[in-house]
Design a protein with these regions (language model features):
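Conserved N-terminal beta1-alpha1 strand-loop-helix module at the mouth
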Residues: 1-172, 177-203
């Protein structure tokens, strides 16, 4: 459904402490194997140890790893050595000025950053799918400084995607909750979102 609506990548959500859309790793592997290039497949993982991430990826075989919790720089270096041909995308949960420093630490070690609105500091971590926006002014600063591709996520929907693109000028948009209805992807919401994207300033 997402591909036919015009998506250029699929995010496949593995086990998470919270949030929507979780599917089994075996199903992730099946989907990843069936998606034709140039559509990218993203494995969303909450693991933070390089060996554990690489082990999970070996069973899923996506083109890209989306690291939804902050992975320490030494682990990113190790992960790059373990998976040199897999794209690494580090999620930065934009809360305050500290997010800028996290982005500066991660950017030289990954292929892209993804700016989201979770809260990893809660007793039950929020690592995505919150439906909340964040301070796009901080996101724009990260985008301007990063030196790598920057994706924008967090509460983006058909009504605000044009404003989000204008404010941050990201490489791409990541979305989840705004195109779901009763926990499942909604064709109508996807179509409305894509119409808004096409009407917005070009990414």
């Amino acid at each position: 459904m997402a591909i036919s609506a015009g998506a250029s990548a699929l995010g496949l959500v593995s086990s998470m402490p919270s949030g929507p859309g979780v599917i089994d790793d075996r199903l992730i592997a099946e989907i990843a194997a069936s998606v034709p290039p140039p559509i990218a497949t993203f494995l969303l993982t909450a693991r933070v140890d390089a060996e554990a991430i690489a082990e999970q990826h070996a069973g899923c075989r996506t083109s890209t790893l989306q690291l939804v919790d902050f992975v320490a720089p030494p682990q990113l270096v190790r992960l790059r050595r373990l998976l040199p041909s897999v794209e690494l995308v580090q999620v930065i949960h934009v809360a305050d000025e500290d997010s800028l420093e996290e982005a500066r630490l991660a950017a030289p070690l990954v292929d892209a950053l993804l700016l989201d609105s979770g809260n990893p500091n809660l007793p039950v971590k929020e690592l995505g799918g919150t439906g909340r926006t964040h301070d796009w002014r901080i996101s724009r600063r990260i985008r301007d400084e990063a030196g790598v591709r920057v994706f924008l996520a967090g509460g983006i929907n058909a009504a605000n995607v044009g404003e989000a693109i204008a404010a941050v000028q990201p490489f791409g948009i990541d979305l989840c909750s705004s195109v779901r209805e009763a926990g499942r992807l909604s064709a109508a919401r996807l179509e409305a979102f894509m119409r808004s994207v096409h009407a917005a300033p070009k990414l």
